[in-house]
Amino acid sequence: MKIALFGGSFDPPHNGHNSVVLEALEKLDIDKLIIMPTYINPFKQSFSADEKQRFLWVKKLWGHLPKVEICDFEIRQKRPVPSIESVKYLYKLYNPSKFYLLIGADHLEKLHLWHDFEKLNSLVEFVIANRNDIGIPKNFKDLKTNKKIASSFIRDTLNTNEVCEEIKDEVKKYYEKLQKN
């Protein structure tokens, strides 16, 4: 079985994330794309939308797609989970012959700082979703999504133009309510 893992905060999920999902399904030779929202990103101190809300948004957007599985492994841990831990969990579950790990190009600069990076690098093939024309190392796959969207911009400005239509209204209401509190 060939699998790909796309993890993230999805705070909120947006058209950039959607491009990654659709490109991965189209371009990668995989049997399953596992989308795994984090409880909290190991490199962040907090999140805006709680984990249940982010999981529901992700499930609503992509849970119905063929080959897609929405996984709550990291959320169930109730703590920051390094990628290597999620990868090992999925290896035990699926014993894949090929394992792709989808990450944003913005992570490349600090990738070597990821927990147990050498082991992680030996277990997966990195697939990079490029959003700012960042140079991709030759040993990584380039997904060529080139969507320049950041969840932080959506949260800060309440501009939901780049939020997927299916959840646009509820995302706007959710963050408006957070800003009022």
UniProtKB/Swiss-Prot annotation:
Class of the enzyme per the UniProt entry, highest EC level: transferase
Molecular function GO terms recorded: ATP binding; nicotinate-nucleotide adenylyltransferase activity
Pathway, per record: Cofactor biosynthesis; NAD(+) biosynthesis; deamido-NAD(+) from nicotinate D-ribonucleotide: step 1/1
Keyword annotations: ATP-binding, NAD, Nucleotide-binding, Nucleotidyltransferase, Pyridine nucleotide biosynthesis, Transferase
InterPro entries (alphabetical): Cyt_trans-like, NadD/NMNAT, Rossmann-like_a/b/a_fold
A biological process from GO: NAD biosynthetic process
Catalyzed reactions per annotation: nicotinate beta-D-ribonucleotide + ATP + H(+) = deamido-NAD(+) + diphosphate
One Pfam family from the record: CTP_transf_like
UniProt xrefs under NCBIfam families: cyt_tran_rel (TIGR00125), nicotinate (nicotinamide) nucleotide adenylyltransferase (TIGR00482)
Function field: Catalyzes the reversible adenylation of nicotinate mononucleotide (NaMN) to nicotinic acid adenine dinucleotide (NaAD).
Protein's name according to its UniProt entry: Probable nicotinate-nucleotide adenylyltransferase
Higher taxonomy: Bacteria, Pseudomonadati, Campylobacterota, Epsilonproteobacteria, Campylobacterales
Gene: nadD
